[in-house]
């Protein structure tokens, strides 16, 4: 009771007079004794004085404040609040300035943005490390080799290289490594299951990288991607087919690609042993799809067909080589392993042996060159003559192609095409005898050798001035540096007529038209 009175007194009057201080001290000292009894006779007097003081304090508290005191108190309160608000704004501005000084901008979501490249970082430490990539600062250096790093963790990992420490060890084998992620990848090799599975062939792998490598070799996956790409191309590109109605009346107006079927003109050649095989090289698009005439059908090959096109081209090349070997004979490839013959007389036995394997008595003759070939249009059943009368030195002409060299001769006439059908037939009995072959070779040697050898007529030199071998097509007057290309080219000439395409049966008027037909691939089947 007395203590509360003293507190109230102190709050009401900020300053105490000496008399009141003395009275209070007297009250504290004489108020009570250790046994709880009042020892001073003046206790009642002091108690009354304390009560009076308490009443005076209560009256002082109950007095209403004046208008000036309220205004003064309001001003004091506002003056206390304003410094707090100002201090928070200053702190925020200071943080922004610090972040901008570090090269970062505070975003609304609390993250920091690099002012150089715009990279968003989650904190100031990450931003500080990132800024080192722009400034080139590397504060962490290796004491042994001098290597520097932007982060301390990279330095600690580097130090393990010098010490040879490998703290991460496999619990299943003796494998140990310096990095935790390397151990995590190694532990997958011990797992029983293979979580990464190919949806196209069913094979499973433990690592995703192995699955990605497998997809590059998976045929089902590549085929599916190719079919999807082809479907998209065909859905966006529907070629007009009005021009194809004249040549292909069977085709639908909305179909630009049809499954490949063997043409009837080639199907008829399968029963004849001496003629070329029916599997002639064609222009394929995709798998078992054939493209018809170039001017009539428009088709944009997608890039996904690249691998399949390469495989198909190699398959077509094998077919062409096989057809040419059947056409010329297996011994026609011998010049690849032998030195080129010096004279035409030495070439004749090779050609004779090659054509003796494919000749048939019921065929018309096959002209080989202007000195060694002749035909007859009336006698279709006579055997073939390998030697041509020298009085009729005619040969076919053709324009240069992309795969061979062109000669300087540019003569061409329609009479050359008729010269193969205007000579009388020779004696069939004499042609079939072996003695006749030898006599023809000798006649060719005596008539052609004085004019000079083949090397004297055609000489081909490389960039270094060295003479190289060349193979000439007598029908097209074209030189080939590669014997395989020469063999393939010879397989394109027709069996009955050199100017007849052996793929589609098209008959050309001269060698220029024949070469253009072969190069453009305008093979149309009716």
From Swiss-Prot:
Annotated effect of mutating residue 170 to Y: Found in patients with autosomal dominant hearing loss; uncertain significance; affects transcriptional regulation as shown in a luciferase reporter assay
Record's subunit section: Can form homodimers. Interacts with IKZF4 and IKZF5.
Phosphoserine carried by residues: 56, 78-79
PROSITE patterns per the UniProt record, alphabetical: ZINC_FINGER_C2H2_1, ZINC_FINGER_C2H2_2
Gene3D superfamilies: Classic Zinc Finger
Organism for this UniProt entry: Homo sapiens (Human)
Protein name: Zinc finger protein Helios
Annotated localization: Nucleus
Role this protein plays: Transcriptional regulator required for outer hair cells (OHC) maturation and, consequently, for hearing.
Biased composition (Basic and acidic residues): 60-77, 370-379
